[in-house]
Amino acid sequence: MAFTFKQFHIDDLNCGMPVSTDGVILGAWAPLAEAKNILDIGAGSGLLSLMAAQRSQGQITAVELEEKAAAACRYNMTQSPWAKRCQLVHGDIQSVCQLAQYQGYFDHIICNPPYFEHGPKASEQHRAMARHTETLGFTPLLDAISQCLSFEGYASLILPIQSLARFKACLNDTALYLVREVWVKSVENKAANRALLLLSKTEVEPYQRTDLTIRGEDGNYTEQMIELTKDFYLKL
């Protein structure tokens, strides 16, 4: 399936995870404007990488393990206005983080991690790889962030609410701090089902916890959502 944004186009036909509202929200929310070196872990089709390229002047490094997704990511990067600032690394993030040139190198890391911790696997192997934490669990993900993030850098993620407690338990075993958290509601007056998280190597006070509602009771995007995503969605 192809998806056209205001400044770039995504072809995600061969990716395990297609373009999603989760990814768009994360890419629009992450504080990327001042970042000079940005790492996209588990890049998939390259959506977050290209959103980061649009929102910053930084160099983008995308890491993707699955072969078909990596090919789609590379293609989407080369077709974008920011091809010269984007590079794809086809491999696993643990190996990438062992490379000396990447340790402590990135001032922003962005990731929409796999989120099915339990339950039946997807039927196609590449889709299952994208959605199951056994490919990249929270502990190795946080280890990779710790290795690659600069001391003054930030990491932005989005997770299902039901995974939040387990993620925070893993976070407690690292030298990373949760400095900002946004609970995301799909519809007004419904319980939040996603959380945007901002991590840092330095503790920030006061800790911030806010809310974002995607749609009102009338089914239309809220003013919050419009303001957040207006630079990307064609009809906003």
From Swiss-Prot:
<dbReference type="InterPro" id="IPR050210">
    <property type="entry name" value="tRNA_Adenine-N(6)_MTase"/>
</dbReference>
<keyword id="KW-0949">S-adenosyl-L-methionine</keyword>
<dbReference type="GO" id="GO:0005737">
    <property type="term" value="C:cytoplasm"/>
</dbReference>
<dbReference type="GO" id="GO:0003676">
    <property type="term" value="F:nucleic acid binding"/>
</dbReference>
<dbReference type="InterPro" id="IPR007848">
    <property type="entry name" value="Small_mtfrase_dom"/>
</dbReference>
<dbReference type="InterPro" id="IPR029063">
    <property type="entry name" value="SAM-dependent_MTases_sf"/>
</dbReference>
<dbReference type="GO" id="GO:0016430">
    <property type="term" value="F:tRNA (adenine-N6)-methyltransferase activity"/>
</dbReference>
<keyword id="KW-0819">tRNA processing</keyword>
<keyword id="KW-0808">Transferase</keyword>
<protein>
    <recommendedName>
        <fullName>tRNA1(Val) (adenine(37)-N6)-methyltransferase</fullName>
        <ecNumber>2.1.1.223</ecNumber>
    </recommendedName>
</protein>
<dbReference type="InterPro" id="IPR002052">
    <property type="entry name" value="DNA_methylase_N6_adenine_CS"/>
</dbReference>
<dbReference type="InterPro" id="IPR022882">
    <property type="entry name" value="tRNA_adenine-N6_MeTrfase"/>
</dbReference>
<dbReference type="GO" id="GO:0008033">
    <property type="term" value="P:tRNA processing"/>
</dbReference>
<comment type="function">
    <text>Specifically methylates the adenine in position 37 of tRNA(1)(Val) (anticodon cmo5UAC).</text>
</comment>
<comment type="similarity">
    <text>Belongs to the methyltransferase superfamily. tRNA (adenine-N(6)-)-methyltransferase family.</text>
</comment>
<keyword id="KW-0963">Cytoplasm</keyword>
<dbReference type="GO" id="GO:0032259">
    <property type="term" value="P:methylation"/>
</dbReference>
<dbReference type="Pfam" id="PF05175">
    <property type="entry name" value="MTS"/>
</dbReference>
<keyword id="KW-0489">Methyltransferase</keyword>
